[in-house]
Amino acid sequence: MSLSPHVENASIPKGSTPIPKNRNVSSIGKGEFLGSSSSNNSSFRMNHYSNSGQPSVLDSIRRPNLTPTFSYSNGVYMPESHRTSSFNDSYLPYDKNPYAKTTGSMSNKSNMKIKTKKNAINTNTRKSSGLIYTTKVDKELSSIDKVNDPNINGLVCAGKTHLGLYKFSPSDRSIKCVHDFITPNSNTSTRGTTSLLPKLSKRTRQNKFSTIADVKTGFNNYKNCIAVCNNSTAISIYDLNKSSSIDNPLITSLCEHTRSINSFDFNMVESNLIISGGQDSCVKIWDLRSNKSKSSNRSDISINTASDSIRDVKWMPGYNFASKNDQGSSTYGNLKSGYKFASIHDSGYLLKFDLRQPAQYEKKLNAHTGPGLCLNWHPNQEYIATGGRDGKCCLWFVGDNANAAENTVLNYGNSPSLHVPNTSLNNSGSLAFPKLTINTDYPVTKLKFKPAYSSNIYNSLLGISSMGDEAEVRIYSLARKYIPKHVLLSETPSLGLVWWDENLIFNIDKGTRINGWDINKEPTVLENLSKNTTTWRDLDGNGLLSVDQEIGSYEVVEPELQPTSSTTCKKHPGTIKNPKNGNPENQGIIGGIKKGFSHTGLTSFTPERPPTLKAGPTFSTKSLTLASGASSFNSSSASLTSLTPQTENREEIAIEPPCIITLDIPQIFNNIRLTKIAHSRKKNVISESSSMKNSPVEKFKYLARQLKFSYIREHNVSDSADTAYKNDIENIDVVKNATETHGDNTTTTNNNDDGDDDDDDDDDDDKIIESHLLKKYNFPENNTWATLMNEKVNNKKSKRNSSSSREFDEKDVRSSISSISASRQSHDRSRKIDKNVEAELQEKIQTLVDLISIATHNASVYLSIDDLTNFKIWILIRDSLLWDLKWMTSSQISSDNASNMDANESSDFEAGENLKTGKEFPEEDGAGTSGAESLVEERPQAFRANSDEPSDAEKKPVSKLKEQLKNTEIIPYAQPNEDSDEVLTKLKELQNQRLESRTKMGETVSDDVIIEEDEHEHQEEEQPHDSPTKSAQFHASPIAKSIPILQKREHRKSFIDTFMLHSPNGYNGDTDIGNEDDNISPRFTYNSVSPRSKVSSLQSYATTTSQLETFKKLSSHTAPIIGSPRHAPSRPDSIGREQLSSSLTKKLAKCKKIIADPPWDTKKLIKQLYNQATETGNVVLTVNILFLFQTIYQITEIDIAKDAIAHFLLLLHRYELFGIAADVLKYCPFEDIMGSEGDQSSIRLFCERCGELITNESSKEKLRAEAQQTGNKKIMDKFGYWYCDSCKKKNTSCVLCERPLKKLTMVILPCGHEGHFQCIQEWFLDENEQECPGGCPGVAFI
């Protein structure tokens, strides 16, 4: 609300100097900078030192007039030059401001600068309209107080050389100095001046007050009294009514303190009492009626607080607040007002006393971590606000414990500040925490509550003034402690404040100005704050941050009061209970206390002394009677009992959190550009994936969040799947046992039925195994393996349904029964496998399963952003890992079967399709072709149980290779020649070496590796079969007899094995993972046969003359593979006693065990992918490969891997991906990944008992040696830092379970007790406890 020019002109009293506008220091003249000529170079400043009351030497230096750099008045924090002045913009227009005339000599450049700054002010900002009074005095000011007379609009201001009475006029809004009690008038004689200060000489330098210069005024009968420090240890009392030149205004001087006085105060109920406190840590109470002489060096009551120096001391106020209702009017008061007082000390302690029991304080609170500087009582509730050097303003409840529940207030979500718990020295002391803490950025030297009644403490207003250079007075509402309600700006730093009434507040500043504001006309900080703010982000300057929040309020809704009785009329808000002089026969409060506590033995309590004969001009009686003191309370005691407001617990005010929106400017601009291009080309809006492609930063963030970098944390997921799998197996065993039990009571029909039952059990078992592996591998339903397994189930069902139609001869039935019994025997022997080897193999399998799952997940992540290149890379890695997993699972299952096979069992030549290519070849016409069923087995070896191995009679031929070999040109012989014997001997030796090497490595021997030959026991002549009709019949028959060969073994089909056999030159083995000792290289001879053909490459040569040469090429790769345990070697179907040719035997004799890794080898493949990623700069893929495969395949040097991961961590930190960086460090397989940077974040633990550094190296070496001797790695779990080797004692135990704290530890901040995370969670969350488990008082958890 703006005012008219008349009002603005009227606000400036005639003859006074208005406050200038804010200007740059460089534009102020020399005289203006130094201040008025009447001001001394030594300016006053209040000092707060615990050891001395003397001023600092630095305080004698005049400081320039400073203005705050930032202000709340214009919304967000704005520079001083851009903000709206809260004390001149509404009342002092620039053309009317006299201060502007003095700056007329300023340059045009400076004037232009002022105009520019004024134009920069936000037009939406509400300007200040609350500044009503302002004046500048010629004397230095340090303290201010109001005259407690409602008929006089008076203020008292004091300084070193000034004690003045000022009156303000609401009509013309002026402030005038009525009388100066130090500087005499022109008509005052020297003698009169000397009579004012009898103990001072006539020299000017002695006409000064103490550096403390606190000033207070009396109440009721003593409302005309002014108390001020005459010197450091004396209090002078002046009479306001004696302002003429002939009267001596000095009433008396109170001097008993041995050190400087810091504070004093008048009692509002017993107005004849005055209390003082100083550096001597003593509280002294004076009765003005007993001190009628001009000087008194003896107090009525002296209390030694036995603490540090007293900074501030205050009586409990005794306001009478009037309230009207239907029945009339009533008043609210406090029965304890005349007896209670409090003091705050340099040590930060807050002490509360009762005058009726002065020997012991009622409460002792540790209010501040540093020196406490000031305190103030709430007008009508037993709360005290304290301010300290630590920059905190705390609200404390100091009422009786019995009434604590009635006065309990909510904290409204504000956690209390941490204070050091202390134990009170008296029985009534209690451990307490502040109800509210307001954090400021400066020491708080002055604070005062608004003198208004409030039933809810949070609806109270509190004015705060600082000790620093903040040129402002902040008014806080306790309902909103973070944002002040009003910020009243002044030209220079504020020195003090006083509330005149509920709406008017005055302050003084270092610029010797007195300012007065009407807070009802002053804008709140929230009104000037911007409702939404936008600022640049700190990271690289490429983003915006916006915050939007509702305004809220500064008040808490409270119910209306319903008074029930009233006996008095409405009074002035500032009036106090008027005690009656009453009956002189009774004693006053001081007399009653002296009689009641004469037996307490208080050393500082002095006995009653005889009254002085000389009476003062304003004192009629010696002391106030007890009846008069009691009557002041009895008049309203009845109404107080029923009308005292009770503060009720209410629900917290829900303040919605701010909504934060982040914007990435480069991405926004890029999206705008792409949108315009798409619109011009009439395309739709780009998808999220395409926008991610155009923003490399977002793509990197997305990949870092979605990709999996470590298989260590995948064990938890796999463990849960394994648990479910084990539960399923247990359920199967239960069903089997129940079936077997039931089967014992029945009769079995025949052996074939038993075999069928076993097959059914195996099918149920295999079904669960297959579903479990499918879940682990994350295969889709249309995957090749899933299709084969589903087809196997259908074939099994159809086989059982059509078993009656099949025709078996006696040999087939016997072979089937013998195979079943052999499988059962082998299953029993498989239980005797070495447990260590089995556990090691299971661990390798689990690692491969986790890596396959991660590869599948990473591939899907790249597919979601249409990155097909990296998608194919991860699919290739997954297929390679599947190959390794297939070999491990198959070798584990079939290892015992291979060791128990008979030497005369036959083996068919295996041929199949490539698993990794996944191509399906069309079937060719002709009698020499075979279907797709002949190229792959019904169920892969990895999914097949030992007992489910088909017999020779049930096996179908894989191809017509045997028929082709029968038609080859052979030479029968009766005795093998030397060349053939040498070849066979060589093959035998190589097989034995292979078996020994596998046994030493602790691995199971697969039947694909060992070739058993028995030339002396089983020798059968192979008969020629030339008829083409026989070949057709061979494929048509469901059960075909195999060709008799010299070497026979149990047939074993594998889908993945066909991958290597489908190459044009046959199968080439592979070396083991990470085997660096194999120096064997392959010899590949590719032919011109189309890879689409389903039959073997040898079949296409069946009708040519080069059949023997083709077989020689095939036979050149039949040598066993040494050091290649992962792949089974291919070998011919039979080695008969027929000698094919001399060239063939020579070729076989010259065969070498030189076979290198095939192209699909996992280690070789991953190394190539790593090199490609480093060359192309694919950071994510490079780091991902190092994380997953470095420890398994040794992709690169360990130092290079650590350096790459360290740079990747820095990149994550740069893009604020701190959570992912923490996971990378947590699951990284390497130690000291950050190198030298990691040493900077090391944590040193010290023993709580002996104080030594906890290293525990001796116990670590002892446990390590024990672990090496016993081979038990779990022994190292005993090592930790929860004990100390130096003192041989444990550190802090859990407060709940009292066990050592070894892992995650929680600390209860209020009391410092520690406990396990599970224990603390159970105590506070599960059991809903709020106190500490150790029994500490106070609420520890809200």
UniProtKB/Swiss-Prot annotation:
Biased composition (Basic and acidic residues): 952-963, 1016-1028
Record-level GO BP terms: positive regulation of macroautophagy; positive regulation of TORC1 signaling
WD repeat residue intervals: 207-248, 256-296, 305-342, 367-406, 439-486, 489-527, 844-884, 1130-1170, 1217-1256
A GO molecular-function annotation: zinc ion binding
InterPro entries: WD40/YVTN_repeat-like_dom_sf, WD40_repeat_CS, WD40_repeat_dom_sf, WD40_rpt, WDR24, WDR59_RTC1-like_RING_Znf, Znf_RING, Znf_RING/FYVE/PHD
RING-type zinc finger locations on the chain: 1294-1336
CDD domains the record matches: mRING-H2-C3H3C2_Mio-like
Residues that bear Phosphoserine: 1037, 1081, 1088, 1090, 1124, 1134
Major subcellular location class: other
Region (Disordered): 1-39, 559-593, 600-619, 630-651, 736-766, 788-831, 942-963, 1014-1047
One Pfam family this sequence matches: WD40
Composition bias type Acidic residues, residue spans: 753-766
UniProt biased composition (Low complexity): 630-644, 815-824
Tagged with keyword Zinc-finger: yes
Record key words, sorted: Metal-binding, Phosphoprotein, Repeat, Vacuole, WD repeat, Zinc, Zinc-finger
Cellular component terms (Gene Ontology): cytosol; GATOR2 complex; vacuolar membrane
Cellular compartment(s): Vacuole
PANTHER family: GATOR COMPLEX PROTEIN WDR24 (PTHR46200:SF1)
Family: Belongs to the WD repeat RTC1 family.
Role summary: May be involved in a process influencing telomere capping.
Name of the protein in question: Restriction of telomere capping protein 1
Organism the protein comes from: Saccharomyces cerevisiae (strain RM11-1a) (Baker's yeast)
